[in-house]
């Protein structure tokens, strides 16, 4: 279902919690600063939407389309985005602590400066994404495709990178203290075992 901006504002401002917007077409919507905490947005189309500074903590965005969406400085703590499309999404300075981004398609997304502490990114395709200066401490990146991803100055301490593909990734200045890289393909193509 497609909503006009006015209808969307009325729904958000109704105070109803949680909001049920499963399968909704919110493509291109301006949701800057909106409180969508605990919202149900399964399979919703949020492509090219402005979600900067929005609160999506504890929301369910399973299989949602967030391609090209602006989520800069958004709050996504413990948000479920499993299987979502985040290709080209902007998540700079976003808070994604303990979020579930497993099995997402997240090519060329920008997570620079984002807080992903304890997040689950297992089995995701994060090729060519930017994680520079991001906090990925204790994150699960097992079996993840990280081809040509940028982790410069990122904190990957205590992260799980088992069986991930880091071919061509930039790890310059990254903190890898206690990181599990067993059976991972390292940037130079060697396998860590």
Regions found by a protein language model. Give the residues of each.
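Tandem repeat scaffolds
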Residues: 3-193
């Amino acid at each position: 279902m497609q909503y006009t901006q006015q209808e969307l504002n009325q729904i958000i401002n109704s105070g109803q919690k949680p909001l049920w917007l499963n399968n909704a077409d919110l493509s291109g919507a301006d949701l800057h600063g909106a409180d969508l905490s605990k919202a149900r947005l399964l399979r919703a189309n949020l492509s090219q939407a402005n979600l900067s500074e929005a609160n999506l903590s504890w929301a369910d965005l399973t299989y949602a389309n967030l391609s090209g969406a602006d989520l800069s400085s958004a709050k996504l703590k413990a948000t479920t985005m499993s299987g979502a499309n985040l290709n080209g999404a902007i998540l700079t300075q976003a808070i994604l602590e303990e979020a579930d981004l497993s099995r997402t398609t997240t090519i060329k997304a920008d997570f620079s400066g984002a807080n992903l502490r304890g997040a689950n990114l297992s089995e995701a395709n994060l090729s060519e994404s930017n994680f520079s200066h991001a906090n990925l401490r204790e994150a699960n990146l097992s079996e993840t495709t990280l081809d040509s991803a940028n982790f410069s100055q990122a904190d990957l301490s205590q992260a799980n990178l088992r069986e991930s593909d880091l071919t061509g990734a930039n790890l310059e200045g990254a903190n890898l203290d206690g990181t599990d890289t067993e059976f991972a393909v390292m940037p130079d193509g060697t396998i860590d075992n």
